[in-house]
């Protein structure tokens, strides 16, 4: 009887073995995590974070490539510092501007930093970190041309697609001949080739271009345009715990002086608000900075002297 039962149990064991193996394999497959799931799990544990961050590589001085194709710029250095502060392992990749938010929500990467303004429309589909920079928008035209912001009706004007500058043009100057481009560089090319009469961009990027050989014959037309969407933030998927981690790291960088050091190395001042004014145009002789981390851009006073 015992032999019979043992034999029967042995047969069952032999029959169950493949099934058990299959179930173990299935369980292993179900327990395997995507890179995004790994990031989320790491965000709530002591394991090192592995974060993939996308940027646009033609938005100087925020993020662009050097002669060797290496990503450099203000945002790249800021990301390096943020990741070091979080003790995270970060990979920064280049992504076309129009693909940043779709790619983020498709889980191709975990965050996007590319001079992206925090707008109500974007906040509907992504979540932003606390602002890390503020900048207005400007109109650039050829020196000697009398083009103005108020005189854009019927005029061909360039701007990069899906930016605050292009949105401003479409909302406030829909009667102008708006030309939209996938990259800022292509907008500059059409300006210098004469295919458009003016170009509108964020202030820092536009001023940086005016300092180049290609921009030497161009100038800012009129005053800086301030909007409610001038704050830049890092974009994440909604509900991602990485938002809180990046906000904490950013606050710590501001407290320990690293943020001021990085910002100052690019914009000549440790104050983000002052940076908007300090990079403005040649002729700025003095910049008065209010020593307040929450200072508004309007609190920065620049005295300009015209060169005869």
List where the protein language model places each region:
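C-terminal motif of bacterial Sec signal peptides marking the signal peptidase cleavage site
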Residues: 25-28
């Amino acid at each position: 009887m015992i032999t019979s039962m043992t034999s029967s149990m042995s047969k069952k064991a032999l029959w169950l073995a493949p099934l058990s193996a299959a179930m173990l394999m299935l369980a292993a497959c179900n327990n395997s995590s995507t890179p995004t799931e790994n990031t989320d799990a790491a965000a709530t544990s002591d394991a090192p974070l592995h974060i993939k961050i996308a940027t646009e590589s033609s938005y100087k001085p925020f993020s662009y490539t050097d002669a060797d194709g290496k990503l450099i710029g203000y945002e790249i250095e800021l990301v390096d510092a943020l990741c070091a502060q979080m003790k995270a392992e970060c990979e920064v990749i280049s992504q076309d501007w129009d693909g940043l938010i779709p790619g983020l929500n498709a889980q191709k990467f975990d965050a996007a930093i590319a001079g992206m303004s925090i707008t109500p429309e974007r906040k509907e589909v992504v979540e932003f970190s606390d602002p890390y920079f503020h900048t207005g928008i400007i109109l650039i035209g050829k020196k000697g041309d009398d083009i103005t912001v108020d005189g854009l009706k019927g005029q061909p004007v360039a701007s990069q697609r899906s930016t605050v500058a292009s949105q401003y043009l479409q909302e406030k100057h829909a009667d102008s001949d708006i030309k939209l481009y996938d990259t800022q560089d292509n907008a500059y090319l059409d300006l210098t080739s004469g295919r458009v009469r003016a170009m509108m961009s964020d202030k820092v990027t536009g001023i940086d271009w005016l300092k180049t050989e290609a921009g030497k014959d161009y100038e800012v037309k009129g005053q800086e345009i301030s909007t409610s969407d001038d704050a830049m933030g890092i974009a994440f998927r909604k509900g991602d715990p990485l938002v809180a981690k990046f906000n904490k790291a950013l606050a710590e960088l501001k407290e320990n002086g690293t943020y001021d050091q990085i910002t100052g190395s690019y914009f000549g001042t440790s104050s983000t608000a002052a940076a908007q004014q300090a990079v403005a145009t040649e002729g700025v002789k003095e910049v008065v900075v209010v020593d307040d981390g929450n200072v508004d851009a309007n609190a920065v006073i620049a005295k300009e002297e015209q060169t005869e």
